[in-house]
Amino acid sequence: MQKDSLPTLSPAVPPYVMLGLTVAYTIFYCLLFVFVYVQLWLVLRYRHKRFSYQTVFLFLCLLWAALRALLFSFYFKNCVTANTLGPFCFWLLYCFPVCLQFFTLSLMNLYFAQVIFKAKSKYSPELQKYRLPLYLLFLSISLLFLLVNLTCALLVKINRANTETVVLVRVTVNDSLFVLCAVSLSLCLYRIAKMSLANIYLEAKGTSVCQVTLIGVTVVLLYSSRACYNLVVLALTKIKSINSFDYDWYNVSDQADLKSTLGDAGYVVFGVILFVWELLPTSLVVYFFRVRKPTLDRSASVIPGHMFSSRAYFFDNPRRYDSDDDLAWSIIPQNIQASFTSDSYDWSCRNNSFTAYTEAEESHLAPEELNPY
């Protein structure tokens, strides 16, 4: 009799809600994958440079969207498989996308630092010697992030005795790097907003300082807030007030390290976290580095051997910025540009006078000499 009086257990989230969320998440990531794939195809279509900041960004975002779409596709019928993956597959689907996001953040730092260096190199050429150390710095930071993430993920799956210690090390190292890169990106954006040459540099790409600042600040806030959340919540995991809200499964928001399976409510929150802290910033990066159709500007000033255009896009022209001197040709002071324009005018006048003289001489020739065939 007592058995019949016990309440019936029911899932925390109805099955149709779980299915609907899975379909929605998968569609979002698939749409982003298709959009990035089209952007990479347009790079070939418009004959842009195949290896540039733009193509590297897009390729990283393409790989990230593919891995996330593959992860959520497991939750249609293979929930158990998704929660009991092997060590490498677990790292590839759950952890490696976070590494890809850190790579994009590091690459954004490198890109905007290059903007500052190139703008300053017009008057301080000695700054170019810092290019190689800058590349090596961000490469070493990215490799450190990757190695720590991979090692800790494998240790969690292989040896669960020290899971909390391993996760603490991973979160401390990786999320600290996230915060440092976010601060560095903020400083770069602040310097760009204060530099007139950098403003011209960005406007030549077809964007504005306000747009760059808005996207950059949003990405910085999203990435840094996620990293700070991981650090704070992991430091407070022993406090009962947090566990009482049943949030202990994701005390690390990028990987469910401390719980082997995700419950129904945990799955919903996991998807929301990925949407806000991953899909949104990645979509902003893809939008910023989208491929534009190259346009011809008739207002460009032409001189023998060089062409200057106020709308020459930074990424879109395949023959621009192949060397360090290209920025100096695209961003020139007013007095130098005026002298180039006057020289171009004198050269064109002499060319026109020579053409007029030639036509006058030819007018004295006989008709059969003008058309010998």
From Swiss-Prot:
Chief localization: membrane
UniProt record, GO biological process: autophagy; bone remodeling; negative regulation of bone resorption; negative regulation of osteoclast differentiation; positive regulation of protein localization to lysosome; positive regulation of TORC1 signaling; regulation of autophagy; regulation of GTPase activity
Membrane topology note: Multi-pass membrane protein
Gene Ontology cellular component terms for the protein in this record: lysosomal membrane
The keyword Transmembrane helix belongs to this UniProt entry's keyword annotation: yes
The family this protein is said to belong to: Belongs to the GPR137 family.
Protein name according to UniProt: G protein-coupled receptor 137Ba
Gene expressing this chain: gpr137ba
